[in-house]
Amino acid sequence: VVIMGILASGRYMYQAAAIHVARYSFYIGKDITGLSPEETEQALQSSISLVNTVFAVATAVGMFGAMLIVPKLIKRVSYKKLIVVSCILGFVSSFITFFIGYNHFWACIPFVILSCVPCGVINCVSSAMVGDCLDYMELTTGRRQNGLGNACQSFVSKLGNAVSTSVIVLMYILTELDLNKIGTSYTVNPLTMSHGIREGMFSLISIVPGISLLLCMIPMFFYDLTGDKKERVTKELAEKRVKEGIVISE
């Protein structure tokens, strides 16, 4: 579960890289040809703000929409299948986004929403999977380390954010952008950027998280706390608790 979470670190790119993609890849707005420097600056800032806002909304719709639906699906579908299916959906959607390209912003948005679905699924299901692992630990060792589960989830979250930031910095280096401009209000005209720069930054919210989602499926094929085994662990643990006089309050 921890390895899966680490390999899925690319899912944080949709939020972390949005402002950078808004600066260097997309421009949506009126034609800036012939505008004064002040009008051009205003148009560029307006585009950055709108792109960033739309990405925030799209990410929220995909992620939180999935988080609302997943609890209902958990009763009928295994955690393993939910993650694998959602990651395949995210992988395919991410690559479609990449091939649509940075010149078609609004056409990308539906697929960005679909790409964010695995983020919500992983957030929900990974917590439940950690709980199942703790059940298995308690059954086999007689000890339940809830703190270990919380620590693992916290570690994965922090590492994921760190990896996202590192990938953004790496992309700045690969595209030969000025690292000193990261986190500043510096404004550039993306229309004057080279194809390599625009596509490189665009890949941060398309192909990069897509590859991450594909990789994170690999550990799931080795996760076997599903189906009959999960039911057996749950049943035997409940019986063990009854024998030991342990009462778990709801």
Regions found by a protein language model. Give the residues of each.
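Membrane-embedded alpha-helical bundles of multi-pass transporters/translocases
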Residues: 1-250
